[in-house]
Each structure stands twice: as C-alpha cells, then as structure tokens.
C-alpha cells in the first residue's frame, strides 16, 4: 500500500469529511478547501482528495460529481459513513428563540422535515462545520447551525436537538480520488463511469443491454444535462465488477453504440 501524505477536502475543521479522514488516514496531512473545484484542482501526482458524492436521503452531490467527471482524477476507494445531524447553537441558546438556521445545502435538505416544523429561515453556506464556527462571529443566540453531533464536546456550543435528519438511516458516500492508485483495497468490485449516448433513437437502450449481456449489475443510473448542449444528457453509472477483462469488453462494445463511455474509478468500499 502506498503511503498517503496529503489529502485535500472541501470544508473546514470539524466537518464530516474531516471525521472520515481522521478515521481512515491518521498519518496524512489534511488540507481544507472552500470549493470542490479547488479541492480537486490541488491534487498532484502524489496527493489525493476526499469528496462526498452521494447521500442516501437526497441523492448525488452534483457539484462534487460534476467537478470529478471533468477532472483527470480516478476513484480509488469508497467510504460510507453514517450521518447524525444535530441542531447546534451558542452556549445558552434555546430552540424556541431560534429564527434562522444555517448549514450546507445538503444538510438543510437532509433535515427538511425537522426545519419545516420550526418554520424558520434557512440560509445555505459552503460547509456544515463552518456554519457552526460562524455562530461565534454572528454572536447571537437566535441563529443555529446544522452539523455533526461531535460538537457536543465543544463548550462554546450547545446541542439544541439531536438526530434531526429526515430518516435515521442517513449515509453519505465519499470517494478518495487521485492520479495514482494507493492500493488500499484488495478487492475492487465496484466501478463508476460516465456514458454519453448517441443522438439517435435507442442508443441508451442498446448500451444498457450490453450491461445485461455481460451480466453486470447496475447500482446507479442518473442523467445530467450536458453544459452547452441543450437537451443532451450524460449518464452517471455505477456497476458491480472486479474483472479488468470484462471492463475492456464493455468499453469495446459500448463504443459501437454510444458517443462516449469512460470509467472513472475501480474501487472497493469501507464502512465507518
């Protein structure tokens, strides 16, 4: 296994991404970035990045996935983490006095049922942990943030309500991406890819039939518009496979019936 020295991540100290890094890569240096574009753009031949790509409640993290597919980076590991959101205020704050909640857009979506019950203003910001730290700058007990329950150990803040996600089974998938395989997982039985169908009837269906013929199980199929090409779409695909020979056969067959097919990752999984 290659030693990982530096990992870039989107967010700030105390974020879910940082908690994943601390659990899996204790010896690496962590570098916080404000945007996914910056996070992925900083990766050199010896560095890596960790990005959240999908949540079990609200789906794909579009900005992360878009930037990943436009980069020349590959996915080398999937990490799945259970997410426990909490409503957090400054020490002494009371939930009945809260008038506004701030957090990352994904966190606000994942807790929408709870927030609708409060009937208060919601303000999206770039990071869950950053939203908590901004409470110190605002210095008001009428604003709360949504982030991880691990802030309960910080005496500057108080947990106003635990477990506020729309469903207790709330998980996020993270990808470790880079330019060289760190060889962290012995079994690489998952694939992520991007497919662009030809602009003719039946192209997508023909492509999907090839997966069936090769007995490959699709676990994700999601369409996204192609920027600059109105009404044309690309498809994010995940499928199960651990044979490079089958991947090669798949690519050869798909080139005959689609405009583009690119595998962006061959990886295994870790559950936290």
Residue ranges and their predicted role:
Residues 1-272:
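Domain-level signature for soluble enzymes in the chorismate/prephenate branch of the shikimate pathway
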């Amino acid at each position: 296994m290659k030693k990982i020295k530096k990992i870039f991540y989107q967010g700030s100290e105390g974020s879910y991404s940082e908690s994943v890094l601390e659990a899996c890569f204790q010896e690496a240096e962590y570098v916080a970035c404000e945007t996914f574009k910056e996070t992925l753009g900083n990766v050199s031949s010896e560095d890596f990045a960790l990005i959240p790509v999908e949540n079990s409640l609200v789906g794909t993290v579009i900005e992360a996935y878009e930037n990943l597919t436009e980069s020349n980076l590959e996915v080398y590991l999937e990490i799945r983490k259970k997410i426990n959101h909490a409503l957090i205020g400054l020490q002494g704050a009371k939930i009945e006095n809260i008038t506004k909640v701030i957090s990352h857009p994904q966190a606000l979506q994942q807790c929408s049922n709870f927030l609708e019950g409060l009937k208060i203003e919601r303000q999206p910001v770039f990071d869950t942990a950053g939203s908590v730290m901004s409470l110190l700058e605002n210095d008001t007990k009428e604003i709360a943030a949504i982030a991880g329950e691990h802030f309960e150990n910080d005496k500057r803040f108080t947990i106003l309500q635990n477990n506020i996600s729309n469903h207790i089974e709330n998980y996020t998938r993270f990808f470790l991406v880079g330019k060289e395989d760190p060889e962290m997982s012995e079994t690489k039985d998952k694939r992520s890819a991007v497919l662009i169908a030809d602009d003719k009837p039946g192209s997508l269906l023909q492509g999907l039939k090839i997966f069936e013929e090769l007995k490959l199980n699709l676990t994700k199929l999601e369409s996204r518009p192609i920027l600059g090409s109105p009404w044309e779409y690309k498809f994010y695909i995940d499928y199960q496979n651990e044979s490079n020979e089958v991947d090669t056969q798949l690519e050869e067959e798909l080139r005959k019936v689609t405009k583009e097919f690119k595998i962006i990752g061959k990886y295994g999984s870790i559950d936290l």
